[in-house]
Amino acid sequence: MLLCSLLLVSCGNGVDKPYAEIADKEVRPILKMAITKAGGLDTWQHIKTISYTKRSRLFLEDGTVESDRIQHHTYTMQPEFSVRIWWHEEGRRHEIDYSPWRVIKKTDGKRDESVDTTALKQNVMSGLYTLGMPFKLLDEGTSHNYEGTTSLKSGEEADVIKATYRPAEHQNHSTSDVWWYYLDHQNGRYLAAMVYHRPTYAYIQNLAFHTDLPVKLFRHRKSYRVDSLRNVQFLRAEFWYTDFKIEMAEANTD
């Protein structure tokens, strides 16, 4: 079922199975520690809905603000996966409704027939992918490689996991970009990520988390344009996540 891929649910086979299916054995204990640190796989699997507000500010190379947008997100994870995102821009209301069978973009209540539905779907799924880290590293079809440790400029020593994706083969993959994830070597805390989106690199720093939720979710992040060695060129974006509401599904006692 598609829902199993989206939620990383092993469909009753226990929480150890996703880790056992990771080919690189060095990745397994590191990722398990990171997911435990973030609240645990079982907790993530039992989320029914997540809603939150996201503010995104994009910057040009000279520091000028390119855009400043506030969006409201609702993800229904089970029993049937769906997404609703809405925001106001230039006096108009925009809304995206997504399910595994369709994706619709509306402006002021009218369906936008000109929208690229493939790109829209990728954007929606990328949002869940970002929000669900590090849990989403267990998505079916993800290829992992352990690349040792590195010292981040923020001072932490981090384990580096490289992740690659094949969207042509796996419908739950939203990108073919190459990602690197930086997890605290001592406790598995998700510190940062880097993505190669041809022809540029972006380094995303996780600055603060909400720690009063069933799982640990972002509060504040910054994204920098960097080179392949993570040398910063300029601040590209800043993100704030607020107003989280999480509804948990009832545990199956069978």
Language model region names:
Residues M1-L3:
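Sec-dependent signal peptide recognition
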Residues L8-S10:
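C-terminal motif of bacterial Sec signal peptides marking the signal peptidase cleavage site
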Residues G12-G14:
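Bacterial signal peptide processing site
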Residues E21-R28:
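Soluble non-cytosolic domains of exported or imported proteins
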Residues I22, M33-R111, E147:
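N-terminal mature ectodomain segment of secretory-pathway/periplasmic proteins
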Residues T43-I47, S154, V215:
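Edge/loop elements at the starts and ends of beta-strands within beta-rich repeat scaffolds
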Residues R102-H173, H197, N252-D254:
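Flexible, processing/modification-adjacent segments and terminal tails
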Residues E156-D254:
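Gly/Pro-enriched, hydrophobic low-complexity segments
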